[in-house]
From Swiss-Prot:
GO cellular component terms attached to this protein's record: ribonucleoprotein complex; ribosome
Gene Ontology terms: biological process: translation
Protein name (record): Large ribosomal subunit protein uL16
Record-linked CDD domains: Ribosomal_L16_L10e (cd01433)
Family matches, as SUPFAM superfamilies: Ribosomal protein L16p/L10e
NCBIfam families xref list: PRK04199.1-4, PRK04199.1-6
Family matches, as PANTHER family: 60S RIBOSOMAL PROTEIN L10
Amino acid sequence: MSDKPASMYRTIDKPSYTRREYITGIPGSKIAQHNMGDLSAEPDDYPVQISLRVEEELQIRHGSLESSRLSANRHLIKELGEGNYKMTLRKFPHQVIRENKQATGAGADRVSDGMRQAFGKPVGTAARLNKDDIVFTAYCDVEQASVVKEAFRRAYNKLSPPCRITVDRGEELLVS
C-alpha cells in the first residue's frame, strides 16, 4: 500500500506522542545516516558554514528527509569528493504518524468499521520543525560554497515547505 500524500501530515494540528515506549509497531526510520562527508573533520576546520532553513512550521516525513539528504549528498560527492566537505542532517523524525485504514471496493461497508475506534495504526515518523529551524548544515571551503548551495537547492526541491539557504559563517570571505 502506498503512502498517503504529505499534505495530510504537513500541518501540526495534534499534540505529539509523548510516550513512544507505549506504542508498538513503529516503522523504522528511512534515514540512513546523519553525518556525511569527512567524518573526522571538525566544523571549525572549514571557514564557511551554510545552512538550509525552513520558513514555516510543519512536519516533514522521514522519506522526504532521506530523499533530500541523498540528492544533496550525491551532488556533493560527485562535485567535491568524499573528504572535502562535512554535511549534517540536523533533525530526527521523532513524531509518530498514524493512519486509520479504510477498506474500499465492493462490500467494504460490511468489513470496515468506519470511524468507530478511529485512533489509527502507526505508519511512519516525521520531524517537527518550527519556523527558521535548520534542516541541513554543510561546512566547506570558500571555493566550494557555490557547489554546496546548488546541492541545497536540489535538497529543498524534495521538501514541501519553502526553504532558504543561509551562510552562517564566512560570508565576508564569499563577498570579497
